[in-house]
C-alpha cells in the first residue's frame, strides 16, 4: 500500500464557492481525508495577467488552455473591479470543510503573496500571515495549525517569519520528504512537508496529454522514493476536471494507492534541511525548494 499526502489549494472565490463543495462530496464518497488550504482575502487573482509578458508564463497559459481551465471570472478577478471577498463570504463552506478535513492557511491575498512576498521585509510578512490566520480562525472557530505558501513562494525569510505562529507544520516548498528547516539561530524550525509531485497545469501539454495524465501520475507516485505529496486545485480538479480527479481516485484504489492529510506523514524524527529559491519545469518564476543539510 502506497500512502500519498493529498493537499488541496483554494486560490479564488469561485474555487471556494463551487470547487470546494464538489471536492468535499467526491472525497466523502471515496472515504478520503485531505489537507485543504484556503485563501481568504478579496480575490485579486486576475492581476496575474501582467505576467503574460513573460514567455514561460504565457506558454503555460496556452498549453493548459487556461481560459477553459479556470474560467474568465478567475482570470479577470480584481482587475477592472474590486475582487470579491473570499473568506467570510464563503464561511459556511469553509466551516464544512473543517468538520471533515485538515484546514490551513494558503494566503491572506494569494496574488500579493505570489507577486510581492519575495521583496517584503519580515515584519510585513508576519503581519500578512497574521491577518490571514486571524480571518481563517474567525471563520472556523478554532486554531489553525498548518499553512502552505501561495505558489510555493518560500525561502529563509518565510521560514523565519512563520516561526512566530507556532504551527504544527508548513507545506511551503517542493522536495522529496518531510524535514525540519534550520533557522538562523541554528535550531530546527517547524516541520516542512514538501510537495513531491507535479501539478496538472505544470505538465499538461508539455509532458503528457490530458487523457493520459492519471496513468502518468500514478506511475510517478509508485516510483516515488521519498514521501509522495500531491497538490490539486479547487479551481481545476473541483471544477473543469472533476471527472478526471474521480477517475484518478478510482484507479489509485485499484493500484493500492491511498490518500491522507499531510499531518499523517509527520514523524517524531525528521532530517534537517533548508528551503532555498529554485525553479522547476512547467512553473514560471522562482519557488521554494528543499535542500537537505550538507548538500549543495
UniProtKB/Swiss-Prot annotation:
Keywords tagged on the record: Antibiotic resistance, Hydrolase, Lipid A biosynthesis, Lipid biosynthesis, Lipid metabolism, Lipopolysaccharide biosynthesis
Organism: Shigella dysenteriae serotype 1 (strain Sd197)
Molecular-function annotations in GO: hydrolase activity, acting on carbon-nitrogen (but not peptide) bonds, in linear amides
SUPFAM superfamilies associated with the record: Glycoside hydrolase/deacetylase (SSF88713)
UniProt key word Membrane: no
Main function: Catalyzes the deformylation of 4-deoxy-4-formamido-L-arabinose-phosphoundecaprenol to 4-amino-4-deoxy-L-arabinose-phosphoundecaprenol. The modified arabinose is attached to lipid A and is required for resistance to polymyxin and cationic antimicrobial peptides.
Protein name: Probable 4-deoxy-4-formamido-L-arabinose-phosphoundecaprenol deformylase ArnD
EC number, as in UniProt: 3.5.1.n3
HAMAP family associated with the record: ArnD
GO BP terms: 4-amino-4-deoxy-alpha-L-arabinopyranosyl undecaprenyl phosphate biosynthetic process; lipid A biosynthetic process; lipopolysaccharide biosynthetic process; response to antibiotic
Reactions accelerated catalytically: 4-deoxy-4-formamido-alpha-L-arabinopyranosyl di-trans,octa-cis-undecaprenyl phosphate + H2O = 4-amino-4-deoxy-alpha-L-arabinopyranosyl di-trans,octa-cis-undecaprenyl phosphate + formate
Alphabetical list of Pfam families matching this protein: Polysacc_deac_1
Pathway entry: Glycolipid biosynthesis; 4-amino-4-deoxy-alpha-L-arabinose undecaprenyl phosphate biosynthesis; 4-amino-4-deoxy-alpha-L-arabinose undecaprenyl phosphate from UDP-4-deoxy-4-formamido-beta-L-arabinose and undecaprenyl phosphate: step 2/2; Bacterial outer membrane biogenesis; lipopolysaccharide biosynthesis
Gene Ontology CC terms: membrane
Organism taxonomic ancestry: Bacteria, Pseudomonadati, Pseudomonadota, Gammaproteobacteria, Enterobacterales
Claim: Chloroplast is one of the keywords in the record: no
Amino acid at each position: 500500500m502506497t500512502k500519498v499526502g493529498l493537499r488541496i489549494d483554494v486560490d479564488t472565490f469561485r474555487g471556494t464557492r463551487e470547487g470546494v463543495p464538489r471536492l468535499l462530496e467526491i472525497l466523502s464518497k471515496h472515504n478520503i481525508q485531505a489537507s485543504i488550504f484556503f485563501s481568504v482575502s478579496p480575490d485579486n487573482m486576475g492581476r496575474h495577467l501582467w505576467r503574460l509578458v513573460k514567455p514561460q508564463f504565457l506558454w503555460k497559459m496556452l498549453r493548459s488552455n487556461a481560459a477553459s481551465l479556470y474560467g474568465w471570472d478567475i482570470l479577470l478577478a480584481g482587475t477592472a473591479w474590486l475582487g470579491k471577498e473570499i473568506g467570510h463570504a464563503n464561511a459556511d463552506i469553509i466551516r464544512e470543510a473543517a468538520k471533515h478535513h485538515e484546514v490551513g492557511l494558503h494566503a491572506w491575498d494569494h496574488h500579493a503573496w505570489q507577486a510581492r512576498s519575495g521583496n517584503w521585509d519580515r515584519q510585513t510578512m508576519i503581519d500578512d500571515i497574521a491577518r490571514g490566520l486571524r480571518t481563517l480562525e474567525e471563520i472556523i472557530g478554532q486554531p489553525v495549525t498548518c499553512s502552505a505558501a501561495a505558489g510555493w513562494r518560500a525561502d529563509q525569510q518565510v521560514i523565519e517569519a512563520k516561526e512566530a505562529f507556532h504551527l504544527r507544520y508548513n507545506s511551503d516548498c517542493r522536495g522529496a520528504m518531510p524535514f525540519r528547516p534550520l533557522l538562523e539561530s541554528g535550531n530546527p524550525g517547524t516541520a516542512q512537508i514538501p510537495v513531491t509531485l507535479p501539478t496538472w497545469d505544470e505538465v499538461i501539454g508539455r509532458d503528457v496529454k490530458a487523457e493520459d495524465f492519471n496513468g502518468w501520475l500514478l506511475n510517478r507516485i509508485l516510483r516515488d522514493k521519498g514521501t509522495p505529496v500531491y497538490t490539486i486545485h479547487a479551481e481545476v480538479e473541483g471544477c473543469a476536471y472533476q471527472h478526471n480527479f474521480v477517475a484518478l481516485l478510482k484507479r489509485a484504489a485499484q493500484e493500492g494507492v491511498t490518500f491522507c492529510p499531510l499531518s499523517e506523514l509527520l514523524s517524531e524524527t525528521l532530517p534537517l534541511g533548508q528551503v532555498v529559491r529554485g525553479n522547476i519545469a512547467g512553473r514560471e518564476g522562482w519557488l521554494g525548494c528543499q535542500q537537505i543539510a550538507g548538500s549543495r
